[in-house]
Structure formats: structure tokens, C-alpha cells
Amino acid sequence: MLTIATLHVALQVFGAFSPSHAAAVTLEHRSARDGNSVAVPANWDVYGYLFNVTVGSPPQNITMLSDMTWMAPFVRSGRCLGQFNPELCVAQGQSFFNEHNSTTFANTTFAQATWPVTAFAPNFTVDYGRDKFCIGEICNKDTLMQVSDFPYPGSVVPVIPFGGIFGLAPTPEAITATSEPVNFQAWKNGKMGPLVGWHTCEVLKSAATCQGGDAQLVFGGTDTTMYSAKKLQSYEIQNPEWLSDAFYPSTPPRSNYWSTSLTGMWIRTDKLSKNYAVPFKAVKTAKRTPPLAVVDEGSEGLGAPLSLNGYKYLVRHIKSAKLASKAIVQNIQQQGSSGYNTADQDWYTVACDGLHEYPDLVYQLDGRKKYTISAGDYVTKLTDMPGSVCYLNINVWKYGRTENGDARVVLLGRAFLKRKYLVLNFEDRSFGLAPLRTG
């Protein structure tokens, strides 16, 4: 989930996984010096994938939201309005980290930071502290983390089913301590390797490889039973200066997303459409540049990515496509199966059968490998409607649009990732994709 996206969701009850469910799997390491690995299951919630860690001494269980665009770890605390007062600062039912119950917690001299707009709370204000942070059995002492200190009582913030955010964004080229994810800090201290492996079990016959969850994260390595290393295509991240202001102005500017150039985006019927990955001028004085594709495993990127112009072309080439009624649009939004910040686009219903006749969506990253999303992964059934009602689950992302209907940024989310194994490499600042073994 992009850190400053606007969410309007109904809260759901989440059965958190215990850290004891972390398991040993067949893992890949870059070298023996890189340290250990641990695999943990994650469960899907309307906000994204959630999993458990422990923080402090003695350990406190904290359910974390996985976020590949967040940086240093964040925990809800008993602080607000510049004071420690859990009764005032934490709403009833909200989980949080109680620093006063940890013998190893320490404040730091890093300046307090505030983000005026976020998905979770306005004027999102944090202090910085250090404490022991464990993923499964792998622990890193003195992990630097964001500790909430909102400028209002806890009752202002809705109760959410997690007590922290586990940032998985790559570190910027100019690394600062406050931009380092938990696993990066642990890798620097020799506790684990520099890789993070990720896959979802959505298209698999069972959830065994996700330890009964919806997805599995491997910290410090990858699960080599789920992909062939020979088929892994890696991409060095590309974070041009204009990307930092593409969504929301940020000070200092952000330059750390898992992103690469999108050099091809086609709709394939009996032939390929024109290429909808249209180069554009990011700034008036610059040369034309290809749009970017940003990896986002969370609730922003659920649908298959297209530009508005590409979406219109797709609709024209599906005979059963009809503009959805207001009632159906409401059901789409309530079901939570499509990305947020798509409110400006039209929605279309389509026939639920004959998907093999629908077009494929084809993408090319950085002038190299091409990837395909078939109709079975971009046509979604509405579960709370009588009869069989399906719709085009396409993400024309609000913040990636250009005025003429092209896209400057698309999100590689669930529809794109569900049949792939994803490798995040924090040492090389690259990400890799390989076909997910489904047998």
C-alpha cells in the first residue's frame, strides 16, 4: 500500500498468526556471511498483508502491515500530544507497543517527523526509538523504529487490525538511519541475508507453502521450492527525480520505490494493440521518458494496471462489457477486491464465462521480459450479488494518470504478482520476478 493513499474501508476482524508459525523452508542465500533466513505466513486484510513480530523485552506480540513503500518500522505507542498516556492516546481495542513494559527500549535524538497526509491518520507524527525486534527466531537489538506521537487523542484514529507497519521499501541511494527497514538493519548487523522473498497462495491448490496463510514472506532469503532461479529476471530500481512528486509532495523527496521502466503495455486479441506505455515529458525541459511500473503488494494495487486509454481499448474489445450500475459499483467498492484511488474510473460488467475469448494484457519491463495477465486474473466475480455478476478489475490508478489518458506510473499489484515469485534485493537495490511454481 502506498504510504499516503486515501483509504475508505470497512474494518474486518483479523486472526493474526503467531510468530511461532515462522517456519524453516528451502532458502537461498547470497553467501554464508549473509546470515540466517526465516519464513513467516501473512494473512490478507482490506489494508494489505498482515503478519506477527515481537518487539521489546519481554517480547510483545505486534501484528504488522507489510508495506513495500514504507521505510523504517512504525509501531503504535501509548504516546500522543507529547506525553505517554495510553488511556488518552490509544483507543479501546487498538493494539499497541507499550514501551514502559520493555526493559530494552530507548529513546533517540532523531528529530520528530510529521507527514501531513497518510492513509492511517492526519498529521502522522512519530518519534524515534530503539528496541529489540524479532521476526520468528531472528532478533536484532537496537532496531530503530518510528513510535507514534500523534497531536490528538487516540479516539480520533479509527481502530485498525494491526499495531504497526513493516516497511519494505528499498533504501535510498543516500542512506539515512530513518529510512532503513527492519530487515535491512538486521542484515547490516549480520543477522540475516539481504533478500526478501514473497509469494501468494491465491492461485495454488493449497496454502501449504504459505503455512496456511494467504502469502509467505521469507526474510533473509527466498523459498527456492517456489521458483526456478534460472527463470528469475532482475531489475535495478529506477527512481528518477520526478517520481518523488508524482503522487504526493514529500520533504525530503522520496527516491526509494521498487520501480523500473514500463516499456510495453498492450492488449492482445488476435493481434497486439498499439503500445499504451507511452513516453512523456516528466518536466517541460526534459526528454520524453517511459512510464514507470511500481511494485505494490497492498490494497492500492489489486486490479490489473492499465492507462485510461488502454482500458477504453479493452472495453471495446469485450462484446459483453456494459457500464456498471451505481448498485454494482457500490458492491465493487464494498467487496474490497479492487484497488483504492480508482474512484475516477468507470466500471464495467462482463460475462463470467468464455474468458478464454477475452484479450490478454501484456507488459514489458525495462525493454526486457514480457509478462501476461489473462482474463481469469482481471475478471472478478461479485460475491454478494444474485446470479453471476463479474466485472473488469482494472486499476487506472488515480495518481499515475496523465491528462491525455496515458499513464506515467502503473502499479504491479495482486493481479500482476499472483502467478510470480518476487525477490527484493536490498543489497543490489533490485527486484526479481520468476514464474511461480503451481504444481
Curated annotation (Swiss-Prot):
Q: Which GO terms describe its cellular component?
A: extracellular region
Pfam name, any one: Asp
The UniProt transmembrane annotation reads none
Q: Which cysteines are joined by disulfide bonds?
A: 352-390
Active site (UniProt): 67, 296
Q: Which residues, renumbered to this chain, are glycosylated?
A: 52, 61, 101, 107, 123
BP GO annotations: proteolysis
* Peptidase A1 domain span: 49-434
Q: Which InterPro entries match?
A: Aspartic_peptidase_A1, Pepsin-like_dom, PEPTIDASE_A1, Peptidase_aspartic_dom_sf
UniProt xrefs under SUPFAM superfamilies: Acid proteases (SSF50630)
List the keywords (alphabetical): Aspartyl protease, Disulfide bond, Glycoprotein, Hydrolase, Protease, Secreted, Signal
- Residues annotated as signal peptide: 1-22
Subcellular location, record wording: Secreted
> Tell me, what does this protein do in biology?
Secreted aspartic protease; part of the gene cluster that mediates the biosynthesis of the mycotoxin fusarin C. Within the cluster, FUS1, FUS2, FUS8 and FUS9 are sufficient for fusarin production. The other FUS cluster members are not essential for fusarin C biosynthesis.
> Which protein family is named in the record?
Belongs to the peptidase A1 family.
Q: Any idea what this protein is called?
A: Secreted aspartic protease FUS4
Instruction: Name the source organism.
Output: Gibberella moniliformis (strain M3125 / FGSC 7600) (Maize ear and stalk rot fungus)
Q: What gene name does this entry carry?
A: FUS4
